[in-house]
């Protein structure tokens, strides 16, 4: 049974042991540190070890930020590097949702203030994602003197996340900040109205 099958069948302890064996055999190279820590964070989470899970998610988040900074520096310096030797930078959704999992971990640990910090960090990343990617594309476009590629970033509305607003609303309410909770609740309905294709059910009245 492989790692994915172990996870799918709920054999989380076996999945953890399997991941340890894969790490010892260098299946995960140094450049795959983000991926390895994401895997470890998720396995510890589903095993109920929320502190260890948060630790590995934090390591992944730190590496994602460092790898992104290095990639910008390479682009600005016109340094071309084989993708196979680059550190895995993490996908945008991985960078965002690791904060969601950290928030849920802190909820399990009854640390609602820390959970709120993660929920707000998730919202911050989403709100700045389009701006960040635009800057990244512009940097590469300036270095592509031959115009080999179209570096125009695509359009998306991912930054308006109903889930991040909902999580923030619940945590603001839980930590005694009803005004903030009300604002975030309004944003939930706004986000769902903006992305109706993603929600195939009728929305309840906002006042509920």
Residue ranges of each PLM-predicted region?
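Residue signature of alpha-solenoid helical repeat architecture, marking inter-repeat boundaries
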Residues: 29-32, 92-93, 152, 157-159
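Residue-level signature for tetratricopeptide repeat
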Residues: 5-6, 36, 43-44, 105, ...
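Inward-facing hydrophobic residues that define packing positions of alpha-helical scaffold repeats
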Residues: 18-20, 50, 57, 64, ...
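Boundary/linker segments of alpha-helical solenoid repeat arrays
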Residues: 27-33, 64-75, 126-137, 189-208
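TPR-repeat structural position
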Residues: 12-13, 50, 112, 178
């Amino acid at each position: 049974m492989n790692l994915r099958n172990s996870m799918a069948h709920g054999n989380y302890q076996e999945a953890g042991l399997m991941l340890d064996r894969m790490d010892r055999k260098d299946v995960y190279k140094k450049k795959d540190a983000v991926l390895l820590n994401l895997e470890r964070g998720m396995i510890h989470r589903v095993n109920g070890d929320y502190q260890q899970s948060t630790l590995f998610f934090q390591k992944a988040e730190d590496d994602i930020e460092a790898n992104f900074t290095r990639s910008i520096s390479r682009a600005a310096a016109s340094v071309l590097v084989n993708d196979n030797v680059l550190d895995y930078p993490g996908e945008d959704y991985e960078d965002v949702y690791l904060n969601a999992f950290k928030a849920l971990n802190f909820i399990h640990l009854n640390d609602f203030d820390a959970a709120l910090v993660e929920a707000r960090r998730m919202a911050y990343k989403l709100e700045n994602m389009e701006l960040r990617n635009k800057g990244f594309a512009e940097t590469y476009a300036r270095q592509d003197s031959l115009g080999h590629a179209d570096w125009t970033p695509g359009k998306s509305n991912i930054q308006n996340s109903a889930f991040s607003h909902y999580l923030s609303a619940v945590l603001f309410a839980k930590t005694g900040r009803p005004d903030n909770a009300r604002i975030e609740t309004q944003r939930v309905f706004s986000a769902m109205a903006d992305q109706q294709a993603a929600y195939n059910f009728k929305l309840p009245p906002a006042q509920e």
